[in-house]
A protein has these predicted regions:
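Compositionally biased terminal segments of proteins
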Residues: 1-176
Length: 176
């Protein structure tokens, strides 16, 4: 997803939801941190994962999905979409809320996207462990976008993680 597409999806999510702040927890959160071209592993994604703080039951997430989500008229028209999610979708290190990165441009029309900080994002993706997440994490490491010591510290901040998953993530940190 290109930056202009990301801005459009954020603007559309704010309009559909009637809010001026959204939370971005997927790979497109990189737009708040990486200036310029995203790694191919992030740019090829056609969805932005959008949540609204406090929407634990997912009612607003469902509204996003139905209005501008996958297979919607928005998706058919523009070729990208917003995926409605809830905060608990991502497993994150303690304190992540205090590290969110603000993204707002004139093109978001007053809607602020609070995006995961890149190390918190990396940890979340590494824990998810799907092939596309592992590729994403490796690309960030190769490009020097993340710092290994910071990743190690963030992993320690993840509570109640299955020891096998923790071990796998530790391996991804030390050998990107």
């Amino acid at each position: 997803m290109k930056r202009g597409e990301f801005e459009h999806a954020i603007r559309a999510a704010g309009a559909v939801l009637g809010v001026n702040q959204v939370l971005v927890i997927g790979s497109q959160a990189l737009h708040a941190t990486v200036h310029g071209a995203l790694p191919d592993e992030a740019a090829r994604s056609v969805e932005v994962d959008v949540a609204v703080r406090g929407d634990e039951e997912g009612r607003l997430a469902d509204l996003v999905d139905g209005s501008i989500g996958e297979a919607s008229m928005f998706h058919a028209t523009f070729g990208y979409y917003a995926q409605g999610v809830v905060e608990s979708t991502a497993v994150l290190p303690e304190g992540w809320e205090g590290r969110l990165v603000r993204f707002e441009t004139p093109a978001t029309n007053g809607v602020v996207a609070w995006c995961l900080e890149v190390h918190d994002l990396w940890i979340s993706k590494a824990i998810a462990g799907r092939p596309k997440d592992i590729e994403f994490c490796a690309a960030l490491a190769r490009r020097g976008i993340v710092d290994g010591k910071t990743l190690e510290a963030r992993l320690v901040m993840v509570r109640d993680l299955d020891p096998r998953v923790r071990h796998a993530v530790e391996g991804r940190i030390t050998s990107p």
